[in-house]
């Protein structure tokens, strides 16, 4: 196969060592992104993930920083083991996926019965595609998570965590596949990767006169004091299950979970929801009898399918109760007297700032919710829930004044202790589907090793670390805060899969999300550890914490002491990490674990500084999924469009934290724009403008603004904003300039800096043009980022351009009204001097009376006082940028309109344009001349 153009350029960059970062006297910038799990081919969704840090890394290098952007491969866990097993068993779906979608040759596919072969094949493919994309990665630091050196690093990490009491053994809830009979992680799933495990309190409501117990699941046991009734779904078939000698009424879904979480759970009967309506149950905390009523908002797949109603604090309950009051015929259908519902009134349990006595009803009103089926209910529920959790205090007698958070735990403990409640674990969202196709459950594993994320002190340190971090976008911070708050103990090891054995219990393997929390520290020394094999924990104690005697440690590890000290110096240079980038679905696990583990293992001066969260990739409007075949492989996109087109599309289609949608039609549009850009540079980069008029200076001022805005946007990872401005924005400026001047010679004045601005996003094209067209010998990455101060700052010209654009619109409107034929003379009347004086006074925040008093000193103006007053009133509505000087604007406007006259004749029917700076002395109808204003000239079409 012939060498692709980008391959030659990449080799030149690689030979020049452009991306290899070593400590020096420059300020460092260290950026990492989640390393890939190479179990399949790279698609364009992955490409966006790695493009964002690459753009930022290139940008910061050009600003003069020493930038480290490394990469590795995550191969821990069971996914590739499962894939190898399925291929070995001849599973057609798996074989078809790898042969037909990923294009794996038969001779390679035959080797895929071994998980190592899968990892090696796709790691090679990933690296090749990353190079084709031009990612500026320091590949010297590459590793896999099963390398002996990395396993030594994980061993050190877990010994340290155990020393701190943060790893323990006991019962623990995990995502579990009943078919595979194994816990599952994110990489093991076809669907439901975002689902977390949540603990629910099961409140028991005994049915009066029966041995049945309606069991309601809740996150908010503290609200039980405000329960008015219990809801069931009329057409749902509930199960009667025996648990510890009690007969519970729950949904089929709850039964599936309970079987995996408790011993001896047996299904003994069924009962339809409609059979339960009208029964009375007992509130275990108040002893009151509560009616069982019908509700449609219940989703039996979540919780138990039974809900106790607290209309004062739960918007869905309030809406459902009001629905029944508005339409009592529903009750009559089930033989319930409507008066039962009429008598139900909300009971306040919690007081919270910003809400009245019944927050749920406030939320219904605020969101305009009128029924229990309104989709806004979920949002309203979350708002009330969060407000009451963080700011609410109890108002019920026994707990009056107690914060909700404290009361919740106390009430839950009492209910469980008295036998009136139990606990069940469930997923935050469903379905959760294993790669084998089975729906997963939450299972309690016994004798399981887990990380104690529930530890109060650890949570506090994690919260402190988060508080110091910059989060992009900022609104995601609340998700991190919530996750730290609810995150419970996490099963950190499994019996099977690839990875690092627990050092004190080697039958267990550290699972993927637990061995990928602080590897950013490992990158700093990864290239120095290659080939060193297993290392004692003391090496990492010294490198990362400065603990121990380097000579003794070096001797024990078989290292040179200079080598060990160089590792310590390198870590000290690069840490703390500046930016960690990853997808939004990892906020509730990996990214929060990353915060916890840094808080536990490293001193505060080494805590990471920032996180950027990505959105998801869509293909023609549908979520990308390799397992479902709904992807565009990156290799195919690169073959068809080339790297710069792919990069520019991914960069400008959405901000990093937004979902982007890959559509071939749009990508082809980007391709056409990029071809036009290259043509412009090749045709006009060597041109220049000698005597620059107002239009030339306008263009250069606007380019100054482009440089400033692009720089600002890139600093904040606003990649789309940056390159919509720097690429499409400048292309638009050139079109507007050409419309006014008839050429684009001005391009030669900005060509160098434009290529520099665009280099982070389209490095291949810009580097090629830099050398071939501009004749430079250097690489653009070695050049300095453009300095906006090298361009004129004349904001008045931007205003003048806006005046011109509006003037053209006004002329076209008049043409339509009077039916003007092409060939007329266009007279443009600029406002008289006194109006400019009035505008200046107004912009100095002078009151109307002060402005009039100043103007009335002019005898000529006094004679037409009413007219002047009317015009001054008009001018008070004008708004100008603060940095615009009125005198300069008046001068600039005259000069600009004269220089841009071509646009007026090209875009209107005028054959000639005459600009009058003094309308009183100019020819033409008086009413046309009198209509002139500073920012809106008067016009007359002389036919």
UniProtKB/Swiss-Prot annotation:
The keyword Protein biosynthesis applies. It holds the Pfam family tRNA-synt_1g. Transmembrane segments: none annotated. It comes from the Archaea. A motif ('KMSKS' region) lies at residues 623-627. Keywords: Aminoacyl-tRNA synthetase, ATP-binding, Cytoplasm, Ligase, Nucleotide-binding, Protein biosynthesis. HAMAP family: Leu_tRNA_synth_A. This is Leucine--tRNA ligase.
């Amino acid at each position: 196969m012939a060498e692709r153009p980008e391959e030659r350029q990449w080799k030149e960059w690689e030979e020049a060592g452009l991306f290899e970062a070593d400590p020096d006297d420059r300020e460092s910038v260290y950026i990492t992104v989640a390393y890939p799990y190479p179990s399949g081919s790279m698609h364009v969704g992955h490409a966006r993930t790695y493009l964002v840090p690459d753009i930022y890394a290139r940008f910061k290098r050009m600003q003069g920083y020493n930038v480290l952007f490394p990469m590795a491969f995550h191969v821990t866990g069971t996914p590739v083991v499962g894939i190898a097993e399925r291929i070995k068993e001849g599973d057609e779906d798996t074989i078809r996926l790898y042969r037909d979608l990923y294009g794996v040759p038969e001779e390679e596919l035959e080797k895929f019965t071994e998980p190592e072969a899968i990892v090696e094949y796709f790691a090679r493919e990933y690296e090749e595609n990353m190079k084709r994309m031009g990612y500026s990665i320091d590949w010297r630091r590459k590793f896999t998570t099963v390398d002996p050196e990395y396993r030594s690093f994980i061993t050190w990490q877990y010994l340290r965590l155990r020393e701190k009491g943060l790893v323990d053994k006991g019962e623990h809830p995990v995502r579990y596949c009943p078919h595979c009979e194994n816990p599952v992680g994110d990489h093991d799933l076809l669907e439901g990767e975002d689902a977390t495990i949540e603990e629910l309190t099961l409140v028991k409501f005994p049915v009066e006169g029966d041995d049945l117990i309606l069991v309601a699941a809740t996150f908010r046991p503290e609200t039980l004091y405000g329960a008015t009734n219990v809801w069931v779904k009329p057409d749902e078939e509930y199960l009667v299950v025996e648990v510890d000698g009690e007969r519970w009424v729950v949904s089929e879904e709850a039964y599936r979970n309970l079987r995996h979480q408790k011993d001896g759970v047996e299904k003994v009967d069924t009962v339809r929801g409609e059979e339960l309506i009208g029964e009375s149950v007992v509130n275990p905390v108040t002893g009151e009898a509560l009616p069982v009523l019908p509700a449609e908002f219940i989703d039996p797949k979540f919780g138990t399918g039974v809900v106790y109603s607290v209309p004062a604090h739960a918007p869905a309950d309030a809406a459902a109760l009001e629905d029944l009051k508005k339409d009592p015929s529903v009750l009559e259908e089930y033989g319930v007297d409507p008066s039962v519902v009429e008598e139900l009134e909300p009971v306040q349990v919690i007081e919270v700032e910003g809400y009245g006595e019944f927050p749920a009803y406030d939320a219904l009103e605020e969101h305009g919710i009128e029924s229990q089926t309104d989709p806004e209910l979920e949002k309203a529920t979350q708002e009330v829930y969060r407000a009451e959790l963080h700011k609410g205090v109890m108002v019920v007698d026994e707990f009056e004044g107690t914060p909700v958070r404290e009361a919740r735990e106390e009430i839950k403990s009492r209910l469980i202790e008295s036998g009136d409640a139990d606990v069940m674990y469930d997923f935050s969202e469903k379905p959760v589907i294993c790669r084998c196709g089975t729906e997963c459950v939450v299972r309690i594993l016994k004798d399981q090793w887990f990380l104690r994320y529930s530890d109060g002190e650890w949570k506090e340190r994690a919260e402190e670390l988060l508080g110091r971090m910059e989060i992009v976008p900022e609104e995601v911070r609340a998700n991190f805060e919530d996750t730290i708050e609810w995150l419970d103990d996490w099963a950190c090891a499994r019996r099977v899969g690839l990875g690092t054995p627990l050092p004190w219990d080697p039958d267990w393997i550290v699972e993927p999300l637990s061995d990928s929390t602080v590897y950013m520290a490992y990158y700093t020394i990864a290239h120095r550890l290659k080939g060193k094999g297993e290392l004692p924990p003391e090496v990492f104690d010294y490198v990362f914490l400065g603990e121990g005697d380097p000579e003794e440690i070096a001797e024990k590890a078989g290292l040179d002491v200079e080598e060990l000290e160089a590792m310590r110096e390198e870590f000290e240079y690069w840490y703390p990490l500046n930016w960690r980038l990853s997808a939004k679905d990892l906020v509730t696990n990996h990214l929060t674990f990353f915060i916890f583990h840094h808080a536990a293992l490293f001193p505060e001066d080494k805590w990471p500084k920032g996180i950027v969260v990505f959105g998801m990739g869509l293909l023609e409007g549908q979520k990308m999924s390799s397992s479902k075949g709904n992807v565009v492989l990156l290799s195919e996109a690169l073959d068809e469009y080339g790297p710069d087109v792919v990069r520019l599309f991914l960069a400008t289609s959405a901000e990093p934290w937004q979902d982007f949608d890959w559509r071939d039609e749009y990508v082809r549009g980007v391709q056409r724009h990029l071809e036009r850009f290259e043509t412009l540079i090749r045709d006009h980069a060597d041109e220049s403008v000698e005597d620059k008029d107002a239009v030339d200076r306008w263009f250069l001022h606007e380019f100054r603004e482009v440089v400033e805005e692009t720089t600002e946007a890139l600093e904040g990872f606003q990649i789309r904003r940056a390159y919509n401005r720097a690429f499409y924005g400048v292309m638009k400026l050139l079109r507007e300039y050409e419309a006014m001047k008839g050429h684009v010679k001005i391009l030669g004045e900005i060509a160098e800096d434009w290529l520099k601005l665009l280099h982070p996003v389209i490095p291949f094209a810009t580097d090629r043009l830099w050398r071939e067209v501009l004749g430079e010998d250097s690489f653009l990455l070695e050049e300095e980022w453009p300095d906006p101060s090298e361009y004129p700052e004349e904001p008045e010209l931007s205003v003048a351009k806006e005046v011109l654009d509006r003037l053209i619109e006004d002329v076209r409107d008049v043409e339509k009204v009077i039916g003007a034929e092409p060939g007329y003379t266009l007279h443009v009347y600029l406002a008289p001097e006194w109006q400019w004086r009035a505008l200046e006074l107004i912009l100095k925040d002078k009151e109307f009376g002060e402005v009039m008093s100043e103007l009335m000193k002019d005898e000529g103006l006094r004679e037409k006082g009413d007219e002047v007053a009317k015009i001054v009133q008009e001018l008070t509505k004008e708004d100008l940028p603060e940095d615009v000087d009125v005198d300069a604007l008046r001068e600039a406007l005259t000069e600009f309109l004269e220089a841009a006259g071509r646009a007026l004749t090209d875009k209107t029917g005028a054959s000639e344009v005459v600009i009058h700076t003094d309308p009183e002395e100019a020819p033409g109808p008086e009413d046309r001349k009198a209509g002139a204003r500073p920012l809106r000239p008067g016009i007359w079409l002389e036919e």
